[in-house]
Amino acid sequence: MANVVALYRYPVKGFAPEACETLFVLDEGRVAGDRVLGIRFADTEAADDAWSRKHGMVALINTPGLARLRVAFDAKGLRLRLSLGKSVLADEALNPEGRRRIGAVLADYVLKLDENPLTEHPERLPLRVVGDGRSPRYHDEESGRVTLHGRGSLRALEAALGMEVSELRFRSNVAVDGLSAWEEQNWVGRKIRIGMLEFAVVKPKTRCLATHANPTTGERDLPILTTLTQKMDQENPTFAVAMVPSGSGGEIHVGDHVALVE
């Protein structure tokens, strides 16, 4: 029997997750509170409330050291706190001045990293904190979608690498145990039920360089992409699947049963 064993959402695109006992899936197919904020380069032409590709933002793909920062987002009070270890770097309301201060603090942090997208591109400054804090919109793809992986696949990847791999590298919303390795990949084009909700599984999730970043140290320390293509014999490096609700959204919970809809 397969069950949900962990749920995550990511208030700020490309930053640390928030572990949850319950997620609310909107009718549109996104998780409430997920990717509601982003840190965008000054020279990115997209409007603040519009979707854009992650290459126009500070994100793990270009700044692996972001993984060291911890995020606490007060969705009701619209307040964001960023910390590094025991040090609070910023604790600001999402008003214009608070956004400016968060952007400045993050720019200072990022510029001190050995690998960063700002030192050679001053035109990307100042950093802009975008998003209203309520609408989930800064996903890898404009369509959003809920993502799910099986821990059986994670264990297979660990065996190929010969070491433990944190599932946080893959930034899924839903982690499931009780599946065989890569079983979830066979769900593409089919429907599953999680608790009381039914989902259509629409595609496998192609991975990027962000998965190489250690979620604790912020170092690129594992060759995830080449392991998936060379040792797992994948044409494209994929891990997890993307899905949308069939019909209306609703809540999913840790402990919910997961099964194919026959």
Q: What spans do the regions from the language model cover?
A:
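Metal-cofactor-dependent catalytic cores
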Residues: 1-262
